[in-house]
A protein has these predicted regions:
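Membrane-interfacial loop-to-helix junctions in multi-pass transporters
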Residues: 1-4, 55-61, 87-101, 132-140, ...
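Hydrophobic mid-bilayer segments of alpha-helices in multi-pass membrane transport proteins
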Residues: 3-14, 21-41, 61-67, 251-262, ...
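Long, contiguous bundles of hydrophobic transmembrane helices that form the permeation core
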Residues: 4, 176, 180-297, 450-453
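Transmembrane alpha-helix interface/packing and boundary motifs in multi-pass membrane proteins
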Residues: 14-21, 71, 105-114, 145-151, ...
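Core transmembrane alpha-helical segments of multi-pass membrane transporters/permeases
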Residues: 26, 49-81, 107, 273-274, ...
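Hydrophobic alpha-helical transmembrane segments of multi-pass integral membrane proteins
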Residues: 65-66, 93-125, 338-377, 381-382, ...
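Re-entrant/interfacial helical elements at transmembrane boundaries that shape
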Residues: 82-85, 117-129, 157-167, 330-331, ...
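Membrane-core helix-loop-helix motifs of multi-pass transport proteins
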Residues: 128-217, 385, 395, 408-445, ...
Length: 453
């Protein structure tokens, strides 16, 4: 009975999310409560399960809250402006350098963990160069989304937070060993960017370089391009407001603070939530000492904070009921009778490979909260640690961002003036290649076993 209810809960959750009948936030709260009642769980017992799940995920929620606020303050203060400007100056009129610079810029901006911010800043900064050089904007969307897919594996990014939340593991234990894999993934994106840039240079030919764009050579839809260009230009008031937030005199201080934060994270100086709380407090007081300024900066980023943190606490209800009711144990026992014994020791590698199609066809919420906990219970019986399964589940993220279920990808293609289908066809093979590169690196560094035992 528990097995049927457990699978029914997961399938109902995934179906409603995929059909967009309800928001993930509502689904994570309402669906497990409904199925818990059907299982005969209620009253104080149900409340204790939910509270235990929320209590378990509270540190992750706190960490995400202050990480988003911290990096929001750093972007507001202009910490990354010199690097952005240096990239734009150095690429010149060489398509190979332009595409390479696009990848570097996207990887840098992706540190804040928000895809929409990455796409807006990257496209707004570098799209005019693509227009002037008549370059194919598909190169821009390809390397931008791949860089974002790799860099979004930070603890304050969505996928890792979901994996750690679903499996009740420490985000730092998942992330720190992933750093070399992320470095290799970014290196792969940079190599790809240079290859695409050289190919674009050959396509254009030397004669085309530095020539102002003609209407005939403008993007596929010149009307759309005109709208996009206009959309990329902020209003004067907005530009002045953004400039007033910059703190160029504190740039070195902010850089040192960020480096210290990352070092503290890697060496485990303090728990992640505490590190980000302390770093945020120092950053906002140093950059915006006046109380009205501090309130304004917090309010400016409150939308992102609420959207992410509310989802984490709602996931606490889901995982608390799934675990506390015994559903996940019953489901894993059932799967043990189905999964061939020879497969069980390789479930981490299988999960890493399967994360590419799974997260393409279903949302991250459905995969991490619905599928991963069940598979992890089976893997645990084969001697694979949940932390290893969490790392394995992240490998497919560059492919996930090409899914039509990812709203921010529509923003990217819209800003760049390309068709979504063209972007998918152009990028998919490269995304799979980056995922496989990260898989090989993860196995080489021992992040999860090729075969346990």
């Amino acid at each position: 009975m528990l097995t049927l209810l457990g699978f029914g809960m997961v399938i109902t959750f995934m179906t409603l999310i995929m059909l967009k009948r309800v928001s993930p936030l509502v689904a994570l709260i309402a669906i497990p409560i409904l199925f818990a009642v059907l299982a005969g769980v209620g009253g104080d017992e149900l409340g204790k399960m939910m509270l235990e799940g929320i209590r378990t995920l509270a540190p992750t929620g706190v960490m995400l809250m202050f990480a988003i606020l911290y990096f929001g303050i750093m972007i507001d203060a202009g910490l990354f402006d010199p690097v952005v400007n240096r990239i734009l100056r150095s690429v010149g009129n060489d398509p190979a350098k332009v595409v390479f610079g696009t990848a570097v810029l996207a990887a840098l901006v992706s540190l804040d963990g928000d895809g929409s911010t990455t796409y807006m800043i990257t496209v707004a900064s570098i799209l005019p160069l693509y227009r002037r050089l008549r370059m194919d904007a598909l190169n821009l969307t390809c390397v931008t989304i791949l860089a974002s897919g790799v860099m979004n594996l930070t603890p304050w990014g969505g996928p890792l937070a979901r994996a750690a939340t679903a499996l009740h593991v420490d985000p730092a234990e998942v992330f720190v060993p992933m750093i070399p894999v992320m470095v290799i993934g970014v290196a792969g994106v940079l190599v790809l960017a240079y290859v695409l840039g050289v190919r674009e240079r050959r396509r254009l030919g030397k004669a085309a370089l530095g020539v102002p764009p003609l209407a005939a050579d403008a993007p596929r839809d010149s009307h759309q391009a005109q709208e996009v260009d206009t959309a990329l230009l902020p209003a004067n008031g907005e530009s002045e407001a953004a400039a007033s937030l910059r703190r160029p005199r504190l740039r070195w201080f902010n850089a040192a603070l960020t480096v210290a934060l990352i070092v503290g994270l890697v060496v485990g100086l303090l728990p992640l939530p505490v590190l980000f709380m302390v770093a945020f407090a120092i950053a906002i007081v140093a950059n915006y000492p006046q109380l009205p300024e501090q309130r304004a900066r917090i309010a400016a980023h409150a939308g992102n904070v609420i959207a992410v943190v509310a989802l984490i606490f709602a996931a606490g209800v889901f995982t608390g009921i799934l675990t506390g009711s015994g559903m996940v144990k019953s489901m894993s026992d059932s799967l043990l009778t189905i999964v061939p014994p020879s497969w069980a020791p390789s479930l981490a590698t299988i999960t890493a490979i399967a994360s590419m199609p799974f997260t393409f066809f279903v949302s991250n919420d459905a995969f991490y909260y619905g599928v991963l906990p069940i598979v992890t219970e089976v893997a645990r019986n084969a001697g694979i640690d949940p932390v290893e399964m969490a790392r394995a589940s992240l490998i497919g993220q560059p492919v996930h961002l090409l899914s039509p279920l990812v709203a921010s990808t529509y923003l990217l293609v819209g800003l760049a003036g390309v068709e979504f289908g063209d972007h998918q066809r152009f990028t998919l093979a490269w995304a799979i290649g980056i995922c496989l590169l990260m898989l090989v690196a993860a196995l080489a560094f021992g992040l999860f076993p090729l075969s346990a035992g």
